UniProtKB/Swiss-Prot annotation:
The lineage of its organism: Bacteria, Bacillati, Bacillota, Bacilli, Bacillales. It comes from Listeria monocytogenes serovar 1/2a (strain ATCC BAA-679 / EGD-e). Its EC number is 2.1.1.80. One of its GO terms (biological process) is methylation. It is an enzyme of class 2 (transferase). GO terms for molecular function: protein methyltransferase activity; protein-glutamate O-methyltransferase activity. S-adenosyl-L-methionine binds at residues 72, 74, 78, 114, 137, 191-192, 207-208. It catalyses: L-glutamyl-[protein] + S-adenosyl-L-methionine = [protein]-L-glutamate 5-O-methyl ester + S-adenosyl-L-homocysteine. Signal peptide: none annotated. Residues 1-262 form the CheR-type methyltransferase domain. Keywords: Methyltransferase, S-adenosyl-L-methionine, Transferase. Methylation of the membrane-bound methyl-accepting chemotaxis proteins (MCP) to form gamma-glutamyl methyl ester residues in MCP. The gene is cheR. This is Chemotaxis protein methyltransferase.
């Protein structure tokens, strides 16, 4: 058992924020502490303090740690019925209101399934009209996987046969996304809790991530998302992430998953 666990963890969160810029206090403490403690025990460190000393010196360990605190569960068109609503109900509205290039942000994009799903949807719905997709995540290693765009069949269960054949090249046991979809996406490292949010988006997609944030962390993220949307732009979130008072952020409810900037 790690001695003085509570005191040690509080010290750890302070120095991680000060030296690494990661604010663990904005994640739910019980879940985050349990996850980090399990990792420390696995790595055979005695205290959070000892672990932090090595974390600052070991780039590989730091990458592992960032991967640990990042939630990376994704698939193409996850919860397909909600993507159908996006394509058939929300996107036509955005296209009607938007002028010029349609700007989309896939926030906390994990290994790329979400932004590539957006690119496939845009390709068939927008046609020759220009669009730009920004895809961001906290973890550099997971972003590298997203750029490569190679996936196992289990990650593609929601895809139709036509989508598999038109958007991917089969490579043995894996599927490689076609280059034209990669070219339409800008991948970038971004921390939702601390980094600057670009402005002027027509659509922001951030699903099944904020459930791991504290109330304060969620409030900050929703406020910044609202500021990043153009008037009439839409925020698409996960089914368990309902915004209780959207008007506080200048948003109005389209349904439980879509919020429009008023």
């Amino acid at each position: 058992m790690i001695p003085d666990l509570e005191k040690d963890y509080l010290y750890f969160t302070r120095v991680v924020k000060r030296d690494l810029g990661l604010d663990l206090a904005l994640y739910k403490e019980t879940q985050m502490k349990r996850r980090i403690l399990s990792f420390i025990v696995k790595k055979k460190y005695i205290t959070f303090g000892e672990f932090f000393k090595h974390l600052k010196k070991d780039a590989v360990l730091l990458d592992e740690f960032i991967s640990l605190i990042t939630i990376n569960v994704s698939s193409f068109f996850r919860n397909r019925n909600r993507w159908d609503a996006l394509e058939k109900q929300v996107l036509p509205r955005l296209l009607e209101d938007s002028r010029g290039k349609l700007r989309v942000w896939s926030a906390a994009c994990s290994s790329g399934e979400e932004p590539y799903s957006l690119a496939m949807m845009m390709e068939r719905s927008v046609g020759t009209r220009h669009y730009d997709i920004l895809a961001t995540d906290l973890e550099p290693a997971i972003l590298k996987r997203a750029v490569i765009g190679e996936y196992q069949s289990r990650q593609m269960e929601e895809l139709s046969e036509q989508e598999r054949h038109t958007a991917f090249v089969e490579k043995g046991d894996t599927y490689q996304i076609l280059p034209k979809y990669r070219k339409s996406i800008r991948f970038r490292r971004h921390d939702l809790l601390t980094d600057y949010y670009e402005k002027g988006f027509d659509l922001i997609v951030c699903r099944n991530v904020l459930i791991y944030f504290t109330a304060e962390g969620k409030h900050q993220a929703y406020q910044k998302f609202a500021e990043s949307l153009r008037r009439g732009g839409v925020l698409f979130i996960g089914g368990s992430e309902q915004i209780l008072n959207p008007a506080d952020y200048g948003l109005a409810t389209l349904n439980n998953f879509f919020y429009i900037k008023t």
